[in-house]
Amino acid sequence: MNHNINHLQKMKRTFLYSSLFGVGMLFAACAEKSRPDLTLPCQNTIAIESTDTPESIMEKAAHIVPSPMQMEALKNEFIAFIHFGPNTFTRMEWGNGMEDPRVFDLKQLDTDQWCEAMKAAGMKMVIFTAKHHDGFVLWQSRYTRHGIMSTDFREGKGDILKDLSASCQKYGLKLGVYLSPADLYQIEHPQGLYGNLSPYTERTIPREVPGRPFANKTTFRFMLDDYNEYFMNQLFELLTEYGPIHEVWFDGAHPKRKGGQRYNYPAWKELIHKLAPQAVIFGREDIRWCGNESGKTRDTEWNVIPYPENPDTTSHFPDMTDEDLGSRTQLCKAKYLHYQQAETNTSIREGWFYRDDDRQRVRSVDDVFDIYERAVGGNSTFLLNIPPNREGRFSAQDVSVLKEVGKRINQTYTTDYLQGAEGPEELLDNNTDTYIVVGPDKKEIVIETPDPVTINRFLIQEAITVSSERVEKHALDAWIDNAWQEVATGTNIGYKRILRFPDVTSNKFRLRILESRMKPAICQVAAYHYAARPPRLEVKRNTEGNVTISTMQQKFGWKTYTQDIARNLNAGFKIHYTTDGSTPTAESKEYTQPFALESGMVKAVALLNNEKGEVCQQQLGTLKRNGRSNRKDLLW
């Protein structure tokens, strides 16, 4: 996306803000009118030349901006995934493509219930698996019988995507579609089209089907083989008959391939851009996979990233799983620099598809809320899967988690404690179209509230459509006891960064930009308070007799990774314990490291903000040197 001078002049205000703070006194800010620090045209993609130096590459990186569609997708922040299909009834994660359509034995459907629950969670869009890898379609396609039209649901006339589209309109949710390029039915069926070695010939999209005319009379001519024609005919259906589509999701997973089948992605892209100009494309140049399916996030998630070939023309988009994608070191290896945001995706259940309510565990509210803060507050979008059950509804446990997550989001992020504060108006007006340019000599922003406020969350946004994501390192300070005290640090900011830290009470806060790529433009800061609570604890002893006291981990066994959820959410708690049977208090010994204990009763409690958590107690029997002991069950 190019930004010319006319566009820049439309920005309401741009200021160079340098704040000077003396002992106990806030001086007036130096606020000279200024434009963004631009030395090149801002673009979505910029080529690296052989003559470029590390310095000129960083200059180019500082001018990479999201497209309008990418920016709208970033504003969605929290979105839903829905995996539904034959796998829901066979209890499989991946089907084989040869399932009898009648295994999809759906009797009732309540997409209003889906949308009501998603809306309650604070989600803004839902992406629906219209066709998963098994090739089974959940809409009334003209081009196959392998789908819902061959089931008993509503006598073969049901259309789940149509129901969902209507519910999205009713509840104010955007709609996206997942259409798997992989198609096991078209691979395994004797007359299947996938990899059938058909010649590429000029073909019209959509292909006419007697008795099923399209209201949209747009047509395309492409050189296609049989499978690409089939795939694009179905894309045409999805993009023209189910309301505005805001995202098209192409999964890179392929359970099986055949016949050297290739995809004509340039044709797919042309069709999408023509029929759904507002849509972003996942798995291609607009949005990338985060690199895992567990909800794990990078500490530094750059969206300005290097490419070995032009992402605007290539059809090859490999998965990016490295921890470091966009550092200076990585960018200097590039042939092209490109803006491409990540979706942090995972499932609320153990698996993408629903299996049961007894053994398939559901993520805790703490877990989902923690991922939300790390993803949305870490320069990415949170995509959470909620699989409907065999009754066509979200299960009660899933709905309960969604509602509580939405409640926490509202309770935490509704009241901005910087409202009414003194500071740059452009940062406090709740308008991301206004901004200040920070630097170059004094990269500090000071905000003063009328009265002391207690906060533990601080939100920062860069004006990334104006001058890219530039901040590389920053810190937040609070004025406490007549001195600045650092309370949190972070690396990049980009679209949004949420800093989390223990409760701090002050009426003066300072944001310091420590490192950046040219002068960054900051468009918003806000301060919030999360109702942190002392976490539950557990006591363990190893075979050497060393006792550890830690936060209790949720029992969730799907795509796990190391993450102390309780500590992330409730920063600043302390653990106190006793070994003599007495009830622990704030005066009891503080737990800081494992300790040796031959036998005895360990009682422990977490304390946070003068609040006391549940007491955890465990009787440890005499240690057996062969590694066995008389340890009794955990008691509450």
Label for each model-derived stretch:
Residues 34-441, 445-474, 478-502, 512-523, ...:
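Mature catalytic domains of secreted/periplasmic carbohydrate-active enzymes
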Residues 1-8, 633-635:
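N-terminal amphipathic/basic-hydrophobic helices that include classical n-h-c signal peptides
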Residues 4-19:
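Bacterial N-terminal signal peptides that target proteins for export
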Residues 457, 506-510, 599-603:
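Short, conserved beta-strand segments of beta-strand-rich sandwich/propeller modules, principally
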Residues 530-636:
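Short, compositionally stereotyped local motifs that mark structural "simplifiers"
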Residues 28-29:
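C-terminal motif of bacterial Sec signal peptides marking the signal peptidase cleavage site
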Residues 20-21, 25:
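Hydrophobic helical h-region of N-terminal Sec-dependent signal peptides
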Residues 456, 472-474, 507, 571-575:
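Short beta-strand/loop motifs in extracellular/secreted proteins, especially
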